């Protein structure tokens, strides 16, 4: 009968229904049908009386917690029994929980007493699925997790860092070098998070240090307050406002956090586009604090992953490798400020304005606050104020409309009362309108984000701060607007993008920035998905216009290689050409080579030759690039970004984690090279791995890549579900089974075999290592040298001392099971 040994137990288990059954042992092809113990398989959904740790699903949605659930005896059957606290964690309404109070059994409620609730227990996964009417559950959005299930993580510390180095050597003149770094360090304790931003820059001339700057733009403490759907921040921070300009301050703030709510309007972040003329470094900053930095190759670039919490003016700087610098500003005004009916969103802060780095300024104490109230289904009222104990006050009021098929629209008016240095107190007004509309039928998006007109006497808080500290280089804004339009024409496979931003000033010349981009994919014979793009842009900064026209054609060469040609014309009508080859056939190693120059440079063999290489590891990302132009210059650039996280359970270097993101530490109990989340992270020699950039307030499943485990390693809990709060360091310990496998036959002292279906467990850890099949056959995994294995059935038990790995032979091992009764 040995040929059926491996299949029969599976068939038996699969026949179990949701009710108690008694197996017909005559159907079992076993040598001794009476010597069979299938009690643990006879009732699906039942467990012996006791308490068990289970993962849970509610209406097919996995919850991010394990519950210690009780099984109690009711009508000669066991049933799951849930405490009121556990019902709250599972998301049941207060009304339902109150109704169960009259029928508690030893402090818990057998939920299957409710005819509309069904449960299913997967014993193999130790997972309980609960199906309940949606009306009995508080939360109806499948993409959001309620506060009761949020995880604040564990105590720990981290460092997220970005390192840059460059060397520029002209054919004539001095060499220059630069070393820079920016990032964030943090410490977590419970729900509290301590954070400090840092930025370091050192320049050299012929190897001699010229200037060194080290700043800590922000040092602050924050924590989520779930009961208020808000975040509390204490320290050096920036005001967060959809009405007023942002400024740096030291003090305390409280802000409602949209991410704690079910999905709704969750803010807006701008897309920054531009054209780099060489290998360039793009820096986005606000209030002199670096927000984003990236190396980009020559040609158009787009930055689309800025945080949606950014408000106000953003400064963009493009530093070309030959020393040229281009600067402009981008507004990050929010789309119309709408709130669902009956809800209030708010932010408030108080303290004293400071410069970046915390330098003391001669500034007044201030308080600022704003709100948005959902008055009607499609109408929101909003407003705010900035109040000081000196000569500046500002008030704002506005209304936002959801016009349904016509889009979204808002209007607001802001009044300022300010007395600037050596001037009389003046009252000024600023008027603003926002509009956004997506045309579903055509797939186009129109955003008129922020027409604003300010009279000459209107003063912002930033302007008042600058004037009080005798900074005279600020501009008195008169009018500004931003328009963006995006349209995809499916029939032509053509995408269009247009953006226009205009600013005028009372005391300075105006500037207009605009960009037009057309892109299309098409096929040429055997060449599929050939991509072309045409981009025209104008950047106006301090009365200097920079016009650029860029044409690019990219031809895919297979699935991971690209041949490209680009043509660029600048404001002086100079035309340059670039030919490049990009190869990403290795997911962790990509490289490119290119040649660029104008017609004369190619003719004289003086085109610029560039090469770049990027290497992705579990511990960070390395980027190298170099450029050389004969008789002109050469340059070298290098960057590395990564993170380091430490807790009481261990520490690990890992891939870069954004400062606003959470992270998750996996403890594999000392087992190295466990791949996590599709090899996004791997455990180190101490068994510790960190998965970076885990979303906050969203149920996230983190997994072990079980197909690529090291030899002789098994993982029981290969999927971990969690919902982390902002900035949390999550933690889970894997049930790692490390050891060798044994295929054998268990024999008792009298030559018989243990009953079919008995578990074989490690005597020390009590982990199940296998099940007894027909004729005592067993497959065991996770065996360690000198393990002692135990089998128990009824009032009987026996123990196995398996052979050590060094004594294993091929074939089936005989495993004597010795009774110690």
Swiss-Prot record:
Disulfide bonds: 798-817
SUPFAM superfamilies found in the cross-reference section: FimD N-terminal domain-like (SSF141729)
Keywords: Cell outer membrane, Disulfide bond, Fimbrium biogenesis, Membrane, Signal, Transmembrane, Transmembrane beta strand, Transport
Deletion consequences: Loss of H(2) production on minimal glucose and complex glucose but not on complex formate medium. Alters production of organic acids when grown on minimal glucose medium. This phenotype was complemented by reintroduction of the yqiG gene.
Transmembrane segments: none
UniProt keyword Signal present: yes
Gene Ontology BP term (one): pilus assembly
GO terms under cellular component: cell outer membrane
Location in or out of the cell: Cell outer membrane
Signal peptide: 1-20
Gene Ontology terms, MF aspect: fimbrial usher porin activity
Domain of life of the native organism: Bacteria
Membrane topology reported for the UniProt record: Multi-pass membrane protein
Any one Pfam family match given in the protein's UniProt record, by short name: PapC_C
InterPro entries per UniProt: Fimb_usher (IPR000015), Fimbrial_membr_usher_CS (IPR018030), FimD_plug_dom (IPR042186), PapC-like_C (IPR025949), PapC-like_C_sf (IPR043142), PapC_N (IPR025885), PapC_N_sf (IPR037224)
Function according to Swiss-Prot or TrEMBL: May be involved in H(2) production during fermentative growth. Involved in the export and assembly of a fimbrial subunit across the outer membrane.
Family: Belongs to the fimbrial export usher family.
PANTHER family linked to this entry: OUTER MEMBRANE USHER PROTEIN, OUTER MEMBRANE USHER PROTEIN YQIG-RELATED
Protein name listed in UniProt: Putative outer membrane usher protein YqiG
Source organism: Escherichia coli (strain K12)
């Amino acid at each position: 009968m040995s040929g059926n040994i491996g299949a029969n137990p599976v068939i038996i288990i699969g026949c179990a229904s949701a009710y108690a059954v008694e197996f017909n042992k005559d159907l079992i092809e076993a040598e001794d049908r009476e010597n069979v113990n299938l009690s643990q398989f006879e009732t699906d959904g039942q467990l012996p009386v006791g308490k068990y740790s289970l993962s849970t699903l509610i209406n097919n949605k996995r919850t991010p917690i394990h519950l210690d659930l009780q099984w109690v005896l009711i009508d000669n059957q066991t049933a799951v029994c849930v405490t009121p606290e556990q019902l709250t964690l599972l998301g049941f309404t207060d009304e339902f929980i109150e109704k169960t109070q009259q029928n508690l059994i030893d402090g818990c409620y057998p939920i299957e007493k409710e005819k509309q609730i069904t449960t299913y227990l997967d014993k193999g996964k130790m997972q309980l699925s609960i199906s309940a009417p949606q009306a009995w559950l508080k939360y109806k959005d499948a993409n959001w997790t309620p506060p009761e299930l949020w995880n604040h993580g564990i105590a720990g510390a981290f460092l997220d860092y970005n390192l840059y180095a460059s060397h520029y050597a002209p054919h004539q003149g001095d060499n220059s070098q630069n070393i820079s770094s920016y990032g964030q360090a943090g410490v977590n304790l419970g729900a509290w998070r301590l954070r400090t931003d840092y930025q370091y820059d050192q320049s050299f001339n012929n190897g001699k240090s010229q200037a060194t700057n080290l700043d800590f733009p922000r040092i602050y403490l924050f924590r989520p307050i779930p009961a208020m759907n808000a975040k509390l921040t204490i320290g050096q921070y920036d005001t967060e406002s959809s009405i007023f300009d942002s400024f740096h301050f030291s003090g305390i703030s409280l802000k409602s956090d949209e991410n704690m709510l079910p999905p709704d309007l969750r803010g807006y972040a701008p897309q920054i586009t531009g054209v780099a003329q060489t290998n360039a470094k793009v820096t986005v900053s606000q209030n002199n604090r670096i927000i984003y930095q990236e190396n980009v190759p020559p040609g158009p670039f787009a930055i689309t992953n800025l945080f949606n919490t950014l408000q106000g003016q953003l400064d963009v700087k493009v530093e070309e490798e030959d020393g040229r610098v281009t600067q402009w500003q981008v507004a990050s005004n929010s789309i119309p400020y709408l709130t669902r009916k009956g809800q209030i969103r708010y932010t408030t802060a108080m303290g004293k304005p400071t410069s970046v780095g915390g330098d003391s300024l001669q500034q007044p104490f201030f308080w600022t606050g704003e709100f948005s109230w959902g008055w009607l289904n499609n109408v929101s009222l909003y407003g705010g104020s900035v109040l000081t104990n000196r000569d500046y006050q500002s008030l704002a009021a506005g209304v936002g409309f959801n016009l349904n098929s016509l889009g979204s629209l808002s209007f607001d008016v802001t009044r300022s009362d300010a007395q600037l240095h050596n001037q009389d107190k003046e009252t000024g007004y600023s008027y603003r309108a926002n509009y956004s509309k997506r045309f579903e039928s055509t797939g186009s998006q129109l955003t008129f984000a922020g027409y604003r007109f300010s009279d000459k006497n209107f003063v912002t808080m930033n302007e008042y701060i600058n004037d009080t500290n005798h900074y005279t280089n600020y501009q008195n804004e008169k009018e500004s607007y931003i328009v963006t339009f995006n349209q995809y024409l499916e029939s032509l496979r053509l995408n269009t993008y247009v953006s226009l931003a205009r600013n005028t000033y009372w005391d300075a010349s105006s500037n207009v920035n605009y960009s037009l981009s057309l892109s299309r994919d098409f096929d040429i014979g055997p060449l599929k998905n050939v991509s072309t793009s045409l981009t025209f842009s104008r950047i106006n900064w301090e009365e200097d216009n920079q016009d650029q026209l860029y044409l690019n054609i990219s031809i895919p060469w297979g699935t991971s290689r690209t041949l490209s040609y680009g043509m660029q014309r600048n404001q002086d009508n100079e035309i340059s050409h670039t030919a490049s080859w990009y190869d990403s056939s290795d997911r962790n190693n990509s490289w490119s080579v290119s040649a660029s120059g104008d017609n004369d440079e190619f003719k004289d063999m003086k085109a610029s030759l560039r090469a770049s290489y990027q290497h992705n590891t579990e511990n960070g990302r390395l980027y190298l690039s170099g450029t050389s132009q004969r008789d002109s210059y050469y340059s070298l650039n290098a960057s590395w970004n990564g993170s380091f996280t430490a807790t009481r359970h261990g520490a690990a270097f890992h891939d870069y984690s954004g400062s606003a993101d959470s992270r998750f530490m996996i403890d594999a109990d000392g087992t190295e090279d466990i791949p996590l989340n599709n090899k996004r992270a791997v455990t180190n020699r101490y068994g510790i791995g960190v998965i970076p950039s885990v979303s906050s307030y969203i149920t996230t499943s983190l997994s072990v890549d079980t197909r690529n485990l090291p030899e002789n390693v098994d993982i029981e809990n290969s999927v971990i579900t969690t919902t982390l709060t902002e900035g949390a360091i999550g933690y889970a310990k894997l049930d790692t089974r490390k050891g060798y496998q044994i295929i054998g036959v268990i024999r008792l002292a009298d030559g018989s075999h243990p009953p079919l279906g008995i578990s074989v467990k490690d005597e020390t850890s009590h982990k199940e290592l296998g099940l007894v099949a027909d004729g005592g056959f067993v497959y065991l995994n996770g065996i360690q040298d000198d393990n002692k294995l135990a089998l128990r059935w009824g009032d009987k038990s026996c123990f196995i001392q398996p052979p050590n790995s060094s004594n294993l032979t091929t074939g089936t091992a005989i495993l004597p099971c010795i009774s110690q009764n």
